Amino acid sequence: MNKYKRIFLVVMDSVGIGEAPDAEQFGDLGSDTIGHIAEHMNGLHMPNMVKLGLGNIREMKGISKVEKPLGYYTKMQEKSTGKDTMTGHWEIMGLYIDTPFQVFPEGFPKELLDELEEKTGRKIIGNKPASGTEILDELGQEQMETGSLIVYTSADSVLQIAAHEEVVPLDELYKICKIARELTLDEKYMVGRVIARPFVGEPGNFTRTPNRHDYALKPFGRTVMNELKDSDYDVIAIGKISDIYDGEGVTESLRTKSNMDGMDKLVDTLNMDFTGLSFLNLVDFDALFGHRRDPQGYGEALQEYDARLPEVFEKLKEDDLLLITADHGNDPVHHGTDHTREYVPLLAYSPSMKEGGQELPLRQTFADIGATVAENFGVKMPEYGTSFLNELKK
């Protein structure tokens, strides 16, 4: 008998809670995503996260301890060697990653692009982080006139290649992306995903077509999601979760346009009758505010998210469990534009916790979440991670 029929896992992308013990190795001493945002905002207003026990993990400006938190609380340390989205999420579901995925905030190394030009016979333009629509406005006409390839990246571990469908035929673009995928399996260039981004139209009026194709990396081992799916449990992936695991172990995927859309979809899944895992990633914190080093926007986004939690609490049933965490930090007042190596919060709540919650021991790996989910549903336990299921008292 499962202790909980449904587990709702929410990853607040990049919401770290202070430097990890190994932060210095990552150039991240002093990083503190929520703490610094709270200071910048002169106090964060997150009453619902506070009720769950956020301030009991650590007090910050506007975020105080409560005598009787609704849920269980602690923080988790990442065991894997990376601080990117894929590493954090794969570890949450029970894997240990010893080769970090690379991000390229300054663009890709010349050696890689030289090799790509040589193997494809086409010149490369762009080579910087950019929004897909903006880079077409900037370079689409040049791409059409020269037959070059627009190569760009984002805050995530991706290499994207855009070309006009009438200039570079789709089958050629796909071949080019396969070549890029092979080249980026090298550890020093290891990107999580290569994406073909074909477009059509005229200068000033370009549109991306549905012929996008992703060349992702599958998790290199079985995750708890695979075990759930193979045991006929539901695994509902919301936001970019399905992409992060390349669809592995996913039974249903719901796309989202924003954090608020993600919260809408979470409420939708709360209304569904299923047995298994609902897994939501809220990416805006990271993509729109962390990398752009915008503490004000980040703080406002955290408050907007918090304001949606009462809808979630209202719909949770006695045999539901809500788990809230993050996948890494991205301190918007830290130097550079990259993620930061931090502890992440962990909050666990069910309406069946009539006595409220208490502190859980510090978690030594994000995989403790995967182990807890696996134990709850009686599926094969991951190699890494220690379940805290029995520490959650009803």
UniProtKB/Swiss-Prot annotation:
Localisation: Cytoplasm
Pathway membership, UniProt: Carbohydrate degradation; 2-deoxy-D-ribose 1-phosphate degradation; D-glyceraldehyde 3-phosphate and acetaldehyde from 2-deoxy-alpha-D-ribose 1-phosphate: step 1/2
Cellular component GO terms, alphabetical: cytosol
Residues the record lists as binding Mn(2+) 1: D13, D327, H328
Record keywords, A-Z: Cytoplasm, Isomerase, Manganese, Metal-binding
Cofactor details (free text): Binds 2 manganese ions.
Biological source species: Bacillus thuringiensis (strain Al Hakam)
Protein name: Phosphopentomutase
Catalytic activity: 2-deoxy-alpha-D-ribose 1-phosphate = 2-deoxy-D-ribose 5-phosphate; alpha-D-ribose 1-phosphate = D-ribose 5-phosphate
Task performed by this protein: Isomerase that catalyzes the conversion of deoxy-ribose 1-phosphate (dRib-1-P) and ribose 1-phosphate (Rib-1-P) to deoxy-ribose 5-phosphate (dRib-5-P) and ribose 5-phosphate (Rib-5-P), respectively.
HAMAP family (UniProt xref): Phosphopentomut
Entry-linked InterPro entries: Alkaline_phosphatase_core_sf (IPR017850), DeoB (IPR010045), Metalloenzyme (IPR006124), Phosphopentomutase_DeoB_cap_sf (IPR024052)
Swiss-Prot/TrEMBL GO biological process terms: 2-deoxyribose 1-phosphate catabolic process; 5-phosphoribose 1-diphosphate biosynthetic process; metabolic compound salvage; nucleotide metabolic process
EC number: 5.4.2.7
Binding-site residues, Mn(2+) 2: D286, H291, H339
Enzymatic class: isomerase
